[in-house]
Amino acid sequence: MPFKTATELGLTQPQYCALVKTLVALEKGRLWQDFDIRFNMEHWGGECGTTCCIGGSAEALGALPHGSLADAASQLSRYGFRYDLQNLFYPYHCKDAWDATQKQAAVALRHYLTTGKENWNMAMETPQ
């Protein structure tokens, strides 16, 4: 199934490209080896980009300003978009998602890019 467009997701092209680049790195399990980024859903990441969640990794890989994707997720929910991007970045509704592996995060991100909807519960059923 093809990805939704940046416009359909309410993202800028750089934000969209950063998420797609992050998906590729997560699916390959190569954040650390290729980009010097450790994955951890509990930590957005600093400007140094050493330990990051999905959003922080995307900002680092896409050379986006620190916190810009978190701001975008918050703004999207205010402008009629669902809370899906915000819930992808901050999965408070699925406590296990805070311990997601790169593989599980990739499933969650791929689902979001394909459907525009967040589904951490489904992603967490993916074997580690």
Language-model segment annotations:
Residues 2-128:
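Catalytic phosphate/metal-binding cores of nucleic-acid and nucleotide-processing enzymes, i.e., regions
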